[in-house]
Amino acid sequence: MSELFAGKYQLKKRLGVGGMAEVWLAELKGPQGFSRQLVIKRILPHLADDDNFITMFEDEARLAARLNHPHAVRVEEFGQAGDVWYLAMEYLDGGDLRHLTRRALTLGENVPIQVLLQMGGDVASALHHAHTLRGAQGQPLNMIHRDVSPHNVLVTTQGQAKLVDFGIARAESNQVKTRTGMVKGKSGYMSPEQALGRT
């Protein structure tokens, strides 16, 4: 069973749900047998009328669309279908780093250190790209992801690491500002500055 969303995306399988949005594997079909898999992230129905959540989602879309890096997930479209806002993003065949390391442990193996170092370098490169982005007038955006964790690092079947989910990222251009002292992210993976509320 699948649902047609936004008049063009066939939702195939729900991949996950969070506090603000749900994520779906989708297929975009076109003429002459064209077909492409994408991921759709859409605001949960009970938040569709919450202006604060919509603005946060718009901030995420704006930030993610600026990223043009081989180790950051690519945003294809930002839109609204009825009263539901959504992002269409590239589909990455693979799994998250958390799943990869747990699977290795289940098999009694470790992920080779060279592989982990390469993935760490890939993610660091994506973070550097995000942090050094500039706005239309050349002003620094000072983007900080704030939720780097194994759950938000996807590893493709070709072994490429990509950083995903800029949902709580902070940037100078955000319309919604985090209150001073408010901490966002997973405590086990926070930088000391983030844990102390300095980002």
PLM regions: where:
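Activation-segment/catalytic-loop signature of the eukaryotic protein kinase fold
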Residues: 78
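Protein kinase glycine-rich loop
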Residues: 11-18, 23
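Protein kinase catalytic-loop region centered on the HRD/HxD motif
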Residues: 124-143
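Conserved short submotifs of the Hanks-type protein kinase catalytic core
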Residues: 82-96, 100
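AlphaC helix of the protein kinase catalytic domain
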Residues: 97-111
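AlphaC helix of the eukaryotic protein kinase fold
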Residues: 44-66
